[in-house]
């Protein structure tokens, strides 16, 4: 539930992802942010937007992407900011949120879009010419779908969606393409590839709260898990089971389809012929365990790929994880 905020927002940490989709937009956003928020003390890290701010912290030394990202986050939160602003895509915001939650840190977040898709929900502003004033921002509590190992070790949070598949969307030469998820997660390599016909191995099983779910689709092209807490599908029967979610504890949904939904590849299914899919709703406390996924299938959380140990994963819905600021 949104409400007017009286929280102080004087000390604002900024992280800009130079590798996100719309790199040229980031300098414009940083300039607009400083002009729009003159009352805030903005600071950042060199190489991550900080060099364009008056208060700049030293950047990380050479290392893997996530190692450098962690260094940047540590530097930013050490000053105990009132707000963390991400400039980039949904993946940048999700990495930052996941980093905070893994450490039980609570810092309100505000996302400015300069990435591939900028779907949200952390990234809520996409126009650098129309950034809201600080007093126009209100806080909102946000949940996520969490992916864990079967024995309960955290893997990732999906605030918009958590996809099980072998590909993820990204940008190359200004074009949206599908990259191999495993290559990016395990090696940091960007290789364009096609979606697997099925993400389920020969011994694939699904189990909700200890009960085995029968396989009803001829194959599993992709699985998408997402919260629906931001949506209101009341009475919209065309959305399937989602029309039952408003006003109930069931605020997350799992959708399994015979073809990949999140892809650049074209298919006549659903446009010229029927597409088959199945839905399952989740409430807090539910546990969906998937075993026997095909080799190199990953969890892709808001565009960020994660390796699944042993080809198994546990999915659950966690409400009220994060405070996000949005335009009133």
Region roles according to the model:
Residues 1-83, 94, 131-133, 139, ...:
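ATP/NTP phosphate-donor binding region
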Residues 18-19, 89-92, 115, 167:
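Short glycine-rich anion-binding loops that position phosphate/pyrophosphate groups of nucleotides
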Residues 86-87, 112:
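Structural motif
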Residues 22-24, 91-97, 118-120:
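Short glycine/serine/threonine-rich phosphate/pyrophosphate-binding segments
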């Amino acid at each position: 539930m949104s409400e007017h905020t009286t929280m102080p927002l004087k000390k604002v940490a900024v992280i800009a992802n130079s590798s996100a989709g719309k790199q040229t937009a980031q300098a414009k956003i940083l300039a607009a942010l400083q002009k729009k928020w003159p009352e805030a003390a903005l600071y950042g890290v060199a190489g991550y937007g900080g060099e364009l701010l008056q208060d700049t912290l030293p950047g990380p030394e050479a290392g893997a992407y996530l190692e450098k990202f962690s260094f940047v986050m540590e530097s930013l939160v050490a000053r105990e900011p009132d707000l963390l602003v991400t400039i980039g895509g949904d993946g940048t915001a999700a990495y930052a949120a996941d980093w905070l939650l893994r450490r039980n840190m609570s810092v309100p977040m505000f996302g400015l879009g300069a990435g591939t898709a900028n779907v949200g929900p952390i990234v809520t502003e996409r126009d650098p010419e129309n950034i809201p004033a600080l007093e126009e921002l209100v806080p909102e509590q946000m949940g996520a779908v969490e992916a864990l190992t079967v024995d309960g070790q955290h893997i990732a949070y999906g605030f918009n969606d958590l996809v099980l598949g072998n590909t993820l969307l990204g940008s190359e030469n200004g074009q949206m393409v599908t990259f191999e998820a495993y290559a990016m997660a395990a090696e940091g390599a960007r290789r364009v590839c096609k979606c697997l016909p099925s993400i389920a191995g020969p011994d694939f099983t699904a189990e909700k709260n200890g009960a085995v779910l029968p396989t009803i689709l001829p194959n599993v092209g992709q699985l998408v898990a997402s919260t629906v807490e931001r949506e209101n599908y009341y009475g919209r029967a065309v959305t399937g089971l989602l029309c039952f979610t408003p006003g109930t504890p069931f605020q997350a949904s799992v959708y399994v389809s015979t073809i990949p939904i999140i892809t650049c590849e074209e298919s006549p299914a659903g446009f010229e012929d029927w597409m088959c899919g199945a839905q399952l709703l989740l409430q807090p406390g539910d546990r969906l365990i998937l075993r026997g996924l095909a080799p190199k299938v990953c969890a892709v959380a808001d565009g960020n790929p994660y390796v699944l140990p042993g080809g198994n994963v546990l999915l659950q819905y966690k409400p009220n994880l994060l405070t996000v600021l949005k335009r009133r």
